[in-house]
UniProtKB/Swiss-Prot annotation:
Quaternary structure and interacting proteins, as annotated: Homodimer. Interacts with EssB.
InterPro entries: T7SS_ABC-Transporter, T7SS_EsaA
Keyword tags: Cell membrane, Membrane, Transmembrane, Transmembrane helix, Virulence
Membrane-protein topology: Multi-pass membrane protein
Organism this protein belongs to: Staphylococcus aureus (strain Mu50 / ATCC 700699)
Identification of the protein by name: Type VII secretion system accessory factor EsaA
Function: Component of the type VII secretion system (Ess). Provides together with EssB and other components such as EssC and EssE a secretion platform across the cytoplasmic membrane in the host.
Gene Ontology CC terms, in alphabetical order: plasma membrane
Transmembrane annotation, as ranges: 7-27, 822-842, 869-889, 903-923, 928-948, 979-999
Gene assigned in the entry: esaA
Length: 1009
């Protein structure tokens, strides 16, 4: 067993030795070449010095223009042939300094452009161009790089001075352009003042002159009109219009006589007509005819029983004769004739269908129409499903049955519309299979747009109405509490007095014992409260009537009167009207189109079946030819049926005795009525007596009024003439007034136009003044700090002559050209290998001797835990001692400056403790797997070191734990980044490693994999 363990130990030792030798060879090759490069760079030319440019400059604005001096600096260096420049990020530049890819890193700071454009500042701040040289170079190489940086800085200062001079000249040119623009604006204002305002004002008095002339003319015409009218009225005689009512006009008398004669003549004519009609009517003939008809009916009634058998016999004979004639008929078509006709008819129809151009054109037209109809249906179905941007309301949401029920539909309607949605999905899948990916369609996602549409509540609101009558003796205050989700408009009336609907307390009149409360208003949902409102979908308004400032006494048994009038409106029904209606309409429209689509699908390409059509037509003709026999049999059946029903028909004809009796009674009544009329005609009518003598009284009436009516007519004619003259004058006055009104309107319009033009001119002048003031203000700022009193501003002069200064980012590592330094990469590698050896020593001891027990477990059950703590402490202390020794040696090798040594030693100690604790835990717990993980971490570090190029860092550098330790020491030695966070992380890792070593689980069977 011991021999086997020694074999395992020998294998592990050989692996470690091979790793160390490989590492030394790799480092010697890599960093030896770098050392040779450093020694050769002393004798090389300047173009062998690689300079990394890090541009962190942010653009700024100067005189309204964007300025990026960092980019200008880089473009300037791009044309430089003496040095080799590359623009990279800060991380790439630092990595290049680390592995020898770059000798100098120049950093353009973030505020470079802003500080460079301080031409208007009185005491401008200096600009610092930061740079850093590679660590560990020879003294001569370091001096050469310093010289390169100085040359680059001097060149850029010259370029920057040229930029300043160009900026000053541009400002002067802008000032010259602005002065010209000011003169142009002033000329434009003067021209507009002359055309817009001055000339119209000069023409303005002419409008007043025209108005005055029209007014004078209208006044004259009005005066003339009134004079003429007054003259006409004064010349009229009032007696002229008086009529003597004691007399009637002769024309009235004549008309009355004529009317009387007409009535008398009409009466005579009516009497003559009556007499003539009485003589012409032959009532006897009518009466005799009716009596004869009555006797015939009696005769027919008596013959009913004797004629029935004769009717039956006659009908039977006729039917038998018809049956014999039909049975004797034979079919004119034989079977062979029918078959020949079938063949000929088929050939004829086939030839007609094949050669008929009109039929072919009709079939092609039908086919094209079907294709166009199918295409239109597909487009309509696409529009029904897809939602177009902004304006489309006819689209389909991807809703389920539960969504429809939540929107207010019953279960039957929800099932109906859910089936339509499934049809839409089915059609969508068929459509997408036929179309490319870019033309695929989808149903619009549903997010309660139908069930939670609050647009009507936001725009229209909900009415709030309530009427209550409250009776109480001690109520003196009203408290109103509104729903915070709504804006209320309206009022609350209490006994006729109005109060706004808002959160408030109102003192009531205590003299009233009865309060009539009326609430009338509108509550509109707030847009920002929509989400909270949808939780309960209820609007609340509370009116609380009570007592103010009442202190309840302990012995006061009288209860305080409180009346709560609360309005709660559940608005769930107001949320889905418009949106739900639109969605159901869209679904119904799609359903109709989809049914048409399924009916026509597959028929557009189906060929026309000519053979089937021909067979159908021929079969129809042949069936008609062969149906002769069947038709003959059918006619015979009808004759048999008529014979069977003949008895019933005869009985119906002969058994109408009841109707005959009724007719006989009606005829008897008619005969009696005609007998009475005959008696009336036999009597002579009595003629009325008319007293024609009274008509003479009308003839004696006087017509003396005719003369006075003639005189009235003459006066009325004269009055009409005067009225026509007045009308002519009035028309003239109206025309003058209309002209006057037009002049006034024109005057008003001209005044308004002048006002508008004056306002436009005023605005333009104000804008010009503002532009001129802005120019004067900006021009005043140009080089306003160029002088300090009467002397030149020395600070500004010094800044403009040498604006950019260089700033060296100090390195922690002493730059001694005569001393070789060790790289942080090799330093980290040595620490890790030392920790692996230490971890393997602890692991080997534990395998050989067992777990270290400093305290016997028999004394206490907690002694095992104390032994684990002591073991972890021993491992950690070992790492601490090794870290202290390695740190002191490395401090001298790196020549760390005095102020940085303590932190450097602390970093080395913590790093060494982390390496020792973690590696020891891996070997103690997972053994060979732990060894594999340790070697894997080492291998990742080798790969990461090999992939460190100036262009960037590889993925392995990001996942390698040792690379982070390497970067930590490199950044600290170059004074780049603070190490506070790194020390905290290392401390946490030390604690974790210490705790892990306390809880080692030993398995019964141990072996190397």
């Amino acid at each position: 067993m011991k021999k086997k363990n020694w074999i395992y130990a020998l294998i592990v030792t050989l692996i470690i030795i091979i790793a160390i030798v490989s590492m030394i060879f790799f480092v010697q090759t890599k960093y030896g070449d770098q050392s040779e490069k450093g020694s050769q760079s002393v004798s090389n030319k300047n173009n062998k010095i690689h300079i990394a440019i890090v541009n962190e400059d942010q653009p700024t604005t100067y005189n309204g223009k964007k300025v990026e001096l960092g980019q200008a600096f880089i473009k300037r260096l791009a044309n430089e042939k003496n040095y080799k420049f590359e623009t990279v990020t800060r991380n790439v530049a630092e990595s290049g300094l680390k592995n020898g890819g770059y000798q100098v890193m120049i950093v353009i700071p973030e505020n470079f452009s802003k500080l460079a454009m301080q031409l208007d500042a009185k005491t401008p701040s200096k600009i610092s161009l930061q740079y850093k040289t590679a660590v560990g170079q020879k003294e001569e190489v370091a001096k050469n790089t310093e010289k390169v940086v100085s040359n680059v800085l001097n060149d850029f200062n010259k370029n920057l001075v040229e930029i300043y001079l160009t900026s000053i000249i541009d400002n002067l040119h802008n000032a010259q352009k602005n002065v010209g623009a000011i003169m142009t604006r002033e000329h434009g204002v003067n021209s507009k003042f002359s055309n817009y305002l001055l000339n119209p004002i000069n023409d303005f008095p002419e409008l007043f002159t025209d108005t005055l002339v029209n007014s004078i003319s209208a006044n004259k015409d009005i005066t003339k009109w009134f004079q003429t009218y007054n003259k006409s009225l004064l010349s009229a005689n009032s007696d002229t219009f008086r009529v003597n009512t004691d007399y009637n006009v002769s024309t009235l008398i004549e008309k009355q006589n004529s009317l009387f004669d007409e009535h008398n003549t009409a009466m005579d004519k009516m009497l003559q007509d009556y007499k003539s009609q009485k003589d012409s009517v032959e009532l006897d003939n009518y009466i005799n005819a009716l009596k004869q008809m009555d006797s015939q009916i009696d005769q027919q009634s008596s013959m009913q029983d004797t004629g029935k058998e004769e009717y039956k016999q006659t009908v039977k004979e006729n039917l038998d004769k018809l049956r014999e004639i039909i049975q004797s008929q034979e079919s004119p078509f034989s079977k062979g004739m029918i078959e020949d006709y079938r063949k000929q008819l088929t050939e004829s129809l086939q030839d007609e269908l094949a050669n008929n151009k009109d039929l072919q054109d009709a079939l092609n037209s039908i086919k094209m129409n079907n294709a166009q109809f199918a295409e239109n249906l597909e487009k309509q179905l696409h529009d029904d499903i897809v939602k177009e941007p902004d304006t489309d309301t006819t689209f389909i949401y991807n809703m389920s049955k539960q969504d429809f029920i939540a929107a207010g539909l019953n279960e039957g309607e929800a099932n109906k519309y859910e089936a339509i949605v499934k049809e839409a999905k089915r059609y969508k899948n068929e459509y997408n299979l036929k179309k490319p990916l870019a033309e695929h369609i989808n149903l619009t996602d549903y997010d309660n747009q139908v069930a939670q549409d609050t647009s009507s509540l936001i725009n229209d609101g909900v009415k709030v109405q309530r009427t209550e009558t409250i009776k109480s003796n001690d109520i003196n205050q009203l408290t109103v509490a509104t729903d915070p989700h709504f804006n209320f408009e309206g009022d609350i009336k209490i006994n006729g007095k109005k109060y706004d609907i808002k959160d408030q307390s109102v003192q009531l009149d205590t003299s009233n014992k009865e309060y009539k409360v009326e609430v009338n208003g509108v509550a509109k949902l707030k847009k920002d409260a929509e989400k909270d409102f949808l939780k309960d979908k209820t609007m609340h308004l509370q009116l609380l009537f009570g007592q103010a400032n009442r202190q309840d006494e302990p012995n006061d048994k009288k209860a305080t009167s409180v009346v709560d009038v609360t309005l709660n409106h559940n608005l769930d029904g107001r949320l889905s009207k418009d949106a739900l209606s639109q969605q159901l309409s869209a679904l119904s429209r799609f359903d109709a189109h989809y049914k048409m689509y399924t009916d026509t699908k597959g028929r557009e390409d189906k060929p026309f079946d000519n053979k089937r059509l021909i067979d159908m037509m021929v079969d129809q003709v042949i069936n008609d030819m062969e149906s002769f026999k069947d038709d003959k049999v059918a006619v015979l059946h009808q004759i048999d049926s008529m014979e069977e029903n003949s008895d019933k028909l005869i009985d119906d004809i002969l058994n109408n005795k009841k109707n005959t009796t009724k007719n006989k009674e009606d005829i008897s009544k008619l005969i009696d009525q005609l007998e009475n009329v005959k008696k009336t005609f036999a009597e002579e009518p009595q003629e009325p007596k008319i007293d024609k003598g009274k008509n003479d009284e009308f003839n004696t009436m006087s017509s003396n009024l005719d003369k006075e009516i003639s005189r009235i007519s003459e006066k009325s004619t004269q009055l009409l003439s005067d009225t026509q003259e007045s009308k002519t004058i009035a028309d003239s006055v109206s025309g003058q007034l209309n002209q006057l009104d037009n002049n006034v309107n024109k005057l008003h319009a001209t005044g308004r136009a002048l006002g508008v033009r004056a306002n436009d001119l005023n605005r333009q002048m104000a804008k010009n003044d503002k532009d001129n003031e802005l120019f004067a203000k900006e021009f005043k700022k140009v080089l306003q700090n160029s002088k300090d009193g009467d002397r030149q501003n020395q600070a500004l002069k010094a800044f403009m002559s040498n604006p950019v200064q260089k700033k060296n980012l100090e390195n922690v590592l002493a730059n001694n050209g005569n001393t070789e330094v060790i790289s942080p990469t090799l330093f980290v590698l040595l620490m890790y290998l030392l920790s692996m050896i230490t971890a393997y020593i602890f692991y080997s001891y534990e395998r050989a001797k067992g777990q270290m027990n400093f305290i016997k477990d028999d004394y206490s059950s907690k002694n095992h835990l104390w032994n684990n703590v002591i073991t972890s402490g021993v491992i950690g202390t070992t790492g601490l001692v090794e870290g202290l020794i390695v740190g002191l040696i490395a401090m001298n090798k790196f020549h760390v400056l005095a102020g940085y040594r303590a932190k450097f030693i602390l970093m080395v100690i913590l790093t060494m403790m982390v390496f020792v604790l973690i590696n020891t835990y891996l070997l103690r717990q997972v053994k060979s797997i732990g060894m594999f993980l340790m070697i894997a971490a080492l291998g990742l570090y080798f790969v990461a070191m090999n992939n460190l190029k100036a262009a960037g860092q590889g993925v392995t550098n990001k996942i390698s734990p040792l690379s982070y330790i390497d970067n930590m020491f490199f950044n600290y030695l170059n004074a780049e980044h603070p190490i506070g966070l790194a020390l905290v992380i290392l401390t946490v890792l030390v604690i974790i490693g210490f705790v892990l070593n306390m809880f080692i689980k030993h398995f019964k069977k141990e072996r190397l994999i």
